[in-house]
């Protein structure tokens, strides 16, 4: 049996204690940091939230591990737009094709990202296209992580991992909007969704900056 020299005891003990910090924080204490106010407090005035009841709350917890969410609708140019704002500490449940769960009875044909210019910079808007369907369908969303919109949530999580390892997890927030309309109305739908997303982001950003 090899004896450990006393001069190594202190640094080795320090390393072991350091390694225990994230284990305790994430396995036992489960430290979670909310870096902004509830996002649905900053919706555009034209958007009306509604209470979906306990069944929807259970559904949100099951599919997104979320206890902070809001859904509602608004009308623009004769079209109805439905939105979902969901915050979760299990980020992958939000960024991995959320339209699969939120858009009913439709199959995505392709996905893309539009880089939308706003007053505060570029906003990466993710889109799900459903082809030449009747009715026409389009879903758009953006994701906020560490108070910033992210184009690649995978990369954002990797970059944040060293910090969250010792400070605790931070939530990701999904701002999602969808609409259906007559064939040929995709242009109007896209415009309406873009306007809502920009407005929602600017209000959310302003409220979060006020907290700091």
Feature-to-residue mapping (PLM):
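Membrane-interfacial, low-structure loops and terminal tails that flank and connect transmembrane helices
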Residues: 1-4
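A short, solvent-exposed beta-edge/loop patch
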Residues: 6-26, 113-212
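Terminal, regulation- and interaction-focused segments at domain boundaries
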Residues: 22-34, 68, 73-78
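Alpha-helical transmembrane signal-anchor/signal-peptide segments
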Residues: 27-47
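Solvent-exposed, non-transmembrane amphipathic alpha-helical segments
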Residues: 40-41, 50, 70, 175-178, ...
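Short, solvent-exposed recognition patches
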Residues: 46, 51-165
């Amino acid at each position: 049996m090899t004896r450990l020299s006393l001069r190594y005891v202190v640094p080795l003990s320090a390393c072991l204690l350091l390694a225990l910090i994230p284990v305790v924080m994430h396995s036992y204490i489960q430290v979670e940091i909310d870096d902004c106010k509830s996002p649905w407090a900053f919706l555009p005035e034209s958007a009306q939230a509604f209470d979906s009841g306990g069944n929807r709350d259970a559904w949100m917890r099951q599919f997104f591990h979320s206890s902070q969410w809001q859904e509602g609708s608004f009308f623009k140019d004769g079209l109805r737009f439905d939105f979902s704002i969901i915050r979760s500490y299990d980020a992958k449940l939000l960024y991995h094709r959320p339209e699969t769960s939120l858009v009913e009875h439709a199959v995505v044909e392709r996905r893309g990202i539009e880089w939308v210019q706003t007053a505060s910079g570029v906003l990466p808007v993710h889109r799900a296209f459903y082809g030449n369907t009747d009715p026409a369908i389009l879903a758009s969303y953006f994701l906020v992580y560490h108070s910033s919109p992210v184009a690649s949530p995978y990369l954002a999580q990797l970059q944040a991992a060293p910090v969250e390892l010792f400070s605790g997890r931070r939530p990701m927030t999904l701002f999602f909007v969808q609409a259906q309309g007559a064939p040929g109305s995709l242009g109007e739908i896209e415009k309406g969704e873009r306007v809502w997303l920009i407005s929602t982001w600017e209000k959310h950003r302003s409220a979060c900056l006020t907290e700091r």
